[in-house]
Amino acid sequence: MKKFLVLLIALIMIATLLVVPGVQTSAEGSYADLAEPDDDWLHVEGTNIVDKYGNKVWITGANWFGFNCRERMLLDSYHSDIIADIELVADKGINVVRMPIATDLLYAWSQGIYPPSTDTSYNNPALAGLNSYELFNFMLENFKRVGIKVILDVHSPETDNQGHNYPLWYNTTITEEIFKKAWVWVAERYKNDDTIIGFDLKNEPHTNTGTMKIKAQSAIWDDSNHPNNWKRVAEETALAILEVHPNVLIFVEGVEMYPKDGIWDDETFDTSPWTGNNDYYGNWWGGNLRGVKDYPINLGKYQSQLVYSPHDYGPIVYEQDWFKGDFITANDEQAKRILYEQCWRDNWAYIMEEGISPLLLGEWGGMTEGGHPLLDLNLKYLRCMRDFILENKYKLHHTFWCINIDSADTGGLFTRDEGTPFPGGRDLKWNDNKYDNYLYPVLWKTEDGKFIGLDHKIPLGRNGISISQLSNYTPSVTPSPSATPSPTTITAPPTDTVTYGDVNGDGRVNSSDVALLKRYLLGLVENINKEAADVNVSGTVNSTDLAIMKRYVLRSISELPYK
């Protein structure tokens, strides 16, 4: 804890060097508070996820990581125009982004500390001077604008590009208490913003490295009070969250190993194929939900917010036993049966098949090009999983891994290799092969090809509709669809000559105006509406105006001008 506090103090000192002199960097309040409230929350009925009116939805999304990394931002924003990237993702029909983040970053924010993110203003001028918390909310605003929802995923205890390799949700710095407090803070902070529809409590709990497993260093699933019992911690954390925010979906992943007799009575166990005793079932990290049969998550009155969430991959990520033997020569239908019988059914598919819960396949995907010796088998796996998802539409939801190019063993939907360039992409292209053959077939869309979003008012990108625009949609109260995607805004009180705060002249006052004014004060732009920017009517535009603008957008003050 001492190290952690020293680190946080250092981060405060760094952050203060990155902001406009004289401007307070308090981020209490956010654009999320200004969102359309409470019309897009989801819950579970049987093996379906439904909206507040009981209409079935299908979460068909993709992962976009970076806030879990040392850069503390959505990766690819240093390659391209991040707004153009987000708009393209929406136009391609991805209705949810699963966004990995780290516990230490959430906890820092909860303590009023806002570490810096990597500067990408050379590609994204609107991001100039934004700290990690401001940048996160800027991304939420833009996801909202194009009709994309977000599932927030704690990927690792600390911001670390390899943090997913750590097996547990706690370490010597991030305790279980901090883990829970960080999540409860997020719940309180965003409970009125349905851009974030769900929390994936912890990414891929698993065992220690090597074939000799140490129980105390590994995630287990049972009814014990052990600190490493993921079932207990997930249940307690979920209940604490739901007491504050009863509308959010809770996604609970599995573990890696599970004892064949259901009893974790070995302090160590050997999983070597040569020297081990074969007493444990193994699977992908986070993909083993066999324990649900013996020890299901019990959220009491909040049970309708629970969704179990396995992960699954192909042989390029790791050559599991089921990718050997008959799988190699099998046709696609035979291969799918092998995967189902040897992995999917008993590890997680039974949960939806027995009516326990719907599932979110939180990660799947893989390489679709290149010279890897297992590429053909990887493509066979992807076809099998794609078809299995489609066969279980509405019961099996999914978020594809991943959007950005930075995943070494899977690649991304963005690529620098063969693909289609897009405006703002600069050196990035869209991977048509991966998208067209594996993701597009399992995106939620109408019979005539319109993508279906999860927002009731904002259509999904330029090629989609809102859920309330479905022809068979049944509302209790009909939401009014928006003609074009637009951000939630606060309009400044009208005056005879000027709309104070409308620095960019678009008729609204929101965080875009704050970003533009910040760029002006940093000398990055020259032409703004200075009369509108002079929100304290002092006759000059300076950092005081920026501070007032922030307070207005964050709802600390209700009127402009502010004298």
From Swiss-Prot:
Q: Which GO terms describe its biological process?
A: cellulose catabolic process
Q: Which domain of life is it from?
A: Bacteria
Give the signal peptide, or none. Answer: 1-27
Q: Which residues form the active site?
A: 204 (proton donor), 363 (nucleophile)
The membrane-spanning stretches of this chain are: none
* Entries under InterPro entries matching the protein: Dockerin_1_rpt, Dockerin_dom, Dockerin_dom_sf, EF_Hand_1_Ca_BS, Glyco_hydro_5, Glyco_hydro_5_CS, Glycoside_hydrolase_SF
Gene Ontology terms for molecular function? cellulase activity
Do the record's keywords include Lipoprotein? no
Q: Where is the Dockerin domain?
A: 496-562
Catalytic activity reported: Endohydrolysis of (1->4)-beta-D-glucosidic linkages in cellulose, lichenin and cereal beta-D-glucans
Q: Which UniProt keywords apply?
A: Carbohydrate metabolism, Cellulose degradation, Glycosidase, Hydrolase, Polysaccharide degradation, Signal
Q: EC annotation? A: 3.2.1.4
Keyword Lipid metabolism among record annotations: no
| Location of the region described as Disordered in the Swiss-Prot/TrEMBL record | 476-495
Name the job this protein performs. Answer: This enzyme catalyzes the endohydrolysis of 1,4-beta-glucosidic linkages in cellulose, lichenin and cereal beta-D-glucans.
PANTHER family referenced in this protein's UniProt entry, alphabetically: ENDOGLUCANASE, MAJOR EXTRACELLULAR ENDOGLUCANASE
Question: Family per UniProt?
Answer: Belongs to the glycosyl hydrolase 5 (cellulase A) family.
Protein's recorded name: Endoglucanase B
